């Protein structure tokens, strides 16, 4: 086998891993949901209340917390500004619901400190990419030309997009850290072992890593 072919095959392998990364994150998320997902918050508040408490403590009460019925809810909209929560999280009283709502409030804190950056725009692009890449891959496979080179270029693009997504994820980690600290300072996490709390905030981060799968037609069909 020629060295060039070996390199292309290696690129394709890493590209395949990049494309599978959101699904792998989703599988890890589901495992945590199965283990800890039924744990209710001891303090008894819901996702809406948790987000509002963080916003009030962060002195940004002007940020709304809205219940959203659209398919792709659960995001922070800096233009309004508002936190959009799905009904399950808005009314939810599970520890995971609270952590998810709190992480979005953490993005509002980043916005307050001018550290939000372009995360919202990037996430919208990742949803678009997650919907488009399977169709693009099929189109490339049925096209004429040199398929190995075409696949190599495609997987190189896929790997680059995934790498940038992981780099952007630093903002999500920071938002989760801010949310964790705010809830802890408000003593809303009292009564929960550290293992449960860590799992809840890990899930909020996995939500973001799994975004190109969960918020696409593939996620709707196969999860």
Residue ranges of predicted features:
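Generic low-complexity, intrinsically disordered sequence content enriched
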Residues: 23, 59, 140-141
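Hydrophobic alpha-helical transmembrane segments
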Residues: 2-13, 144-157
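Short, structured loop/turn "capping" segments at alpha-beta junctions
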Residues: 116, 134-135, 148
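N-terminal signal-anchor transmembrane alpha helix of single-pass membrane proteins
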Residues: 8-26
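Alpha-helical transmembrane segments of multi-pass membrane proteins
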Residues: 17-21, 157-168
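Residue-level signal for the membrane-embedded core of alpha-helical transmembrane segments
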Residues: 129-132, 154
């Amino acid at each position: 086998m020629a060295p060039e072919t070996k390199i292309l095959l290696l690129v394709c392998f890493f590209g395949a891993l990049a494309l599978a990364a959101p699904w792998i994150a989703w599988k890890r998320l589901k495992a945590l949901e199965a283990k800890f997902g039924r744990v209710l918050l001891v303090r008894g508040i819901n996702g809406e209340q948790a987000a509002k408490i963080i916003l009030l403590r962060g002195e940004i009460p002007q940020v709304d917390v809205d219940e959203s019925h659209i398919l792709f809810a659960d995001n922070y909209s800096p233009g309004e500004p508002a936190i959009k929560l799905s009904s399950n999280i808005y009314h939810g009283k599970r520890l995971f619901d609270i952590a998810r709502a709190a992480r979005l409030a953490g993005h509002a804190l980043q916005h307050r400190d001018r550290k939000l950056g372009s995360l919202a725009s990037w996430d919208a692009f990742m949803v678009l990419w997650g919907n488009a890449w399977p169709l693009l891959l099929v189109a490339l496979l049925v096209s004429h030309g040199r398929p190995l080179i075409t696949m190599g270029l495609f997987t190189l693009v896929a790997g680059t997009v995934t790498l940038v997504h992981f780099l952007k994820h630093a903002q999500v980690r920071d938002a989760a850290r801010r949310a964790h600290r705010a809830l802890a300072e408000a003593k809303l996490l009292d009564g929960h072992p550290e293992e449960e709390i860590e799992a809840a905030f890990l899930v909020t981060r996995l939500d973001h890593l799994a975004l190109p799968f969960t918020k696409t037609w593939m996620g709707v069909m196969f999860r």
